[in-house]
Amino acid sequence: MDFLGNGYMRNKSIKFLEFAGEVGNMIGARRIVTHIGPYNGISSKDAIDRLVPIFQQMRNHYLEKGYTSQICFELAGKHDLFGSIREITELCRRVKGTAPCINWPHLHARGNRWLNDRESFKRVFDYLQASLGLTKFYTHFSGVEFDIEGNERHYSPIKKGEIKFEYLAEVILENGYNVLTISDSPLMEHDAMYMKLITERVQSRRMERIARREASEKIKESRKAAAEAK
């Protein structure tokens, strides 16, 4: 996609998204996800100013056609592509009815490999809630590999990547976030099941901790009651 390109490339991208909306409507797709493409030499601010009317018209086109699919803008991992989390959030804020697609490996690469603990994932959810008031989140997950200069090269299986899905699962479960996570891994189905397994393990450990804490509190209350009875 190249929504910031010359007239031909921009119009071609618009036609692709119109067609995606038509097909998505036929199959009952809930979301139509798109990248924006390269900056083509313009600033981030100018890019957003150009994109807003394009996607306002596209949103209106979907509504006029009766399409129920939501347009989602996916984060980009490379710095020459439009798609930082702040850019995508601002675009969604200005084009009502659209939403971000949080691609975790792209975000990790774009942010100089910073998704390395639970708190870093939590900050993303906090930012999206504060900026857009989101209560539902649509995300993509996989491993990611880098070239010798530290630039994003390609997706990898989750076990070979440096982003730990356990951290994401813990943050989702502990905060009760409503999150749909899609596997972008080269081992798509395998890693989808792997993420499900990790989530179940995290939830099991979480419930065990809660049970132990509740049992400990009951013991304390029982001992306190016994002491008072004396």
Predicted segment positions?
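Acidic/histidine-rich catalytic cores of soluble enzymes
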Residues: 57-151
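N-terminal small/glycine-rich loop or linker at the start of catalytic domains
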Residues: 1-4, 148-152
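Generic structural signal for hydrophobic
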Residues: 24, 91-92, 128, 172, ...
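C-terminal accessory extensions appended to soluble enzyme cores
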Residues: 169-230
